[in-house]
Amino acid sequence: MLHELLLALLGYTGDLIIDRRDNNLSANTPISDECTFKLAPDISFIDPSDRELIERIITLGFYYRELERFSAKSRNLNWIRSENANPLENKEKPSVYRRALANGIVEILAVYSSSILHIEQLLLSETMPILATVTQGLNKFFSLLPPLYELILKIERGDIRGGELLNLLHKKCHCGVPELQTCIQRLLWHGHQVMYNQLASWMVYGILEDRHGEFFISRQEGRDVENSSSHQEISEKLSRLSTADASLSDWHMGFHISLDMLPEYIPMRVAESILFAGKAVRVLRNPSPSFLSQDDVYPQEPKRFPKIHGFEGRFNFQREPIINTGMRVEDLLPQSEADKIENMLLDLKESSEFHKRSFECAVDSIQAIAASHLWQLVVVRADLNGHLKALKDYFLLAKGDFFQCFLEESRQLMRLPPRQSTAEADLMVPFQLASLKTIGEEDKYFSKVSLRMPSYGITVKPSLLNVPKATSAAADGISGASISNASSEMSVDGWDGIALEYSIEWPLHLFFTQEVLSRYLKVFQYLLRLKRTQMELEKLWASVMHQYHSIFAKNKKSDQDKSPITQQRDQRFRSMWRVREHMAFLIRNLQFYIQVDVIESQWNILQSHIQDSHDFTELVGFHQEYLSALISQTFLDIGSVSRILDGIMKLCLQFCWNIENQDNFSNTSELEHIAEEFNKKSNSLYTILRSSRLAGSQRTPFLRRFLLRLNLNSFFESTAKEVMNVVRPRPTFPGLNQR
């Protein structure tokens, strides 16, 4: 009877103690949600008090058996063979975290079984009360096994695994029973061993070792290359991607944080640092062969990929072969730095308890190491500052002589509407001519710049671009509605779609994303329209002055300079010239504000950040602030202001084209309409810029300078007040309506 009781405490029932369930339990039999061990009902010689005590004691045997079944099932590695044979037959997904938990449970059960053995030896050697001795020897396990049983029952029913399992164990650690707390902490320690191994794989080697999707760093759906069970599939997928393309995809959209698997005691900030560090190590471990071949300083010496002792042998690392070139992979992430990362993780792994502060400090240190070496790669080796300067030269029009020459060479072409099929090829001729005249051979970045002419949608009608010369009588007969229609059709210029592309090579794609380049392009198209408008106003000066001097010389020879017609023409000329001067004044000050107060000042701020910072993540943030400041301080993020500025530039172009296509400034009606619209828009612009909406923004310091230049003699302020009047006389050119 003694041995049957002891066997029941180890999970084996018999005649005295029976199991209400079938004894033929398979590995897949679910855990029972209630104790099924009980004393046989036909045993009548046991006192009710002893029966009650025995039934209480044998519950430990039931808990032991269920815990042992859970451990055996979780530690069973037969799924490896069955997965290779037929993956579809695996109904239950394996879990390395459950296996780690099972290892911890086995340790606790080993202590329990040794206690049973000690009780047996004690009872056989001495004459002692059986039930009292058993109860006294196993008393501490009544506070351990039932909570552990409830734990595995919850895990089985909820299919809890991975980070969710760590989170559950961490919550269970907060209890008032010291023995139970110690056991749960030991189980959590086993789970953390798996997590630290995965962290080592990710943060030392840059490889995601997570076959069962339990790590809080995971691949995006549809991009699971490393976790594929077939090595042939890995080779096929990697062969389709170049190193640069693969690292680009990995960096921007290859990996993400799985919130379901992120333990609550690991903050999101720390998880993001882990994600960044692993991605950075991937970049440093897998450089582009073309990038390696650019550096001839180092001797060409083939070297094996280093193994990190302490974690080697745990992971099946697969790497693409690196071409034997000048620069070595080890130069990007030195072995000493990899050892430093490994030692930090080993210190955490060997600690008996999880200390949140120590964990966060270690992650921050590893993130700083990765960011520093990534900074060294991108900023120093890849010459980031040179590329930033090139983007400033070409996308922000810092090379003004080049774009001035380009616009002059393409001026006649841009008077015609772009042709859908040949617009880009047509622009390449003036683009190449401008480069030959202004770009020196020492500019190694110009080869990365290419001109593009994407689809521009609405085509500008040639009749609107080349305004036919009309008689004054016909011009006076144009109605306001027809002028308005012409202006609305004119508002879309196909050449506004001119775009630049910049060729980005590994590893600069980590810094210059498509979003960043699109923001540069947005500013470029705006600045090019502005410079084109300024050039047309300047060309108008030269053209009209040449025309005026020719007429003046001709009239002087014929003594007509005092005639009423000549005086009337001079009045029209002066009135037109005042409008042109107002346009040029606004455009010139706007361009000076953008180039000097905005671009140059923000560029100097960015340069100081680049010199002071040695952290890649900080540098990305500084560059984003730089671009945001460019867009906000040029008002591209305010729809109302940007629309007014676009309208002003198009009115200026209309004004120039109308005058250049007229003799003696005869088309007075359309010029009056353009002048009136320009006054409205320029005064509206000044009113908006002075509004309280912009007063408290980061635009304020430089915006005040711009407003000071515009309103130097209070002209804009006085005219803006006139615009606010309900009834305002239509501005006319003096002398134009006397006819």
UniProtKB/Swiss-Prot annotation:
GO molecular function: gamma-tubulin binding
Any single GO BP term: microtubule nucleation
Record localization: Cytoplasm, Cytoskeleton, Microtubule organizing center
Matching InterPro entries: GCP (IPR007259), GCP_C (IPR040457), GCP_C_sf (IPR042241), GCP_N (IPR041470)
Key words, A-Z: Cytoplasm, Cytoskeleton, Microtubule
Record-level GO cellular component terms: cytoplasm; microtubule; microtubule organizing center; spindle pole
Keyword Ribonucleoprotein assigned: no
Keyword Cytoplasm: yes
Domain of life, per lineage: Eukaryota
Function: Gamma-tubulin complex is necessary for microtubule nucleation at the microtubule organizing centers (MTOCs).
Protein family: Belongs to the TUBGCP family.
Protein name per its UniProtKB record: Gamma-tubulin complex component 4 homolog
Organism: Medicago truncatula (Barrel medic)
Gene, per the UniProt record: 85P
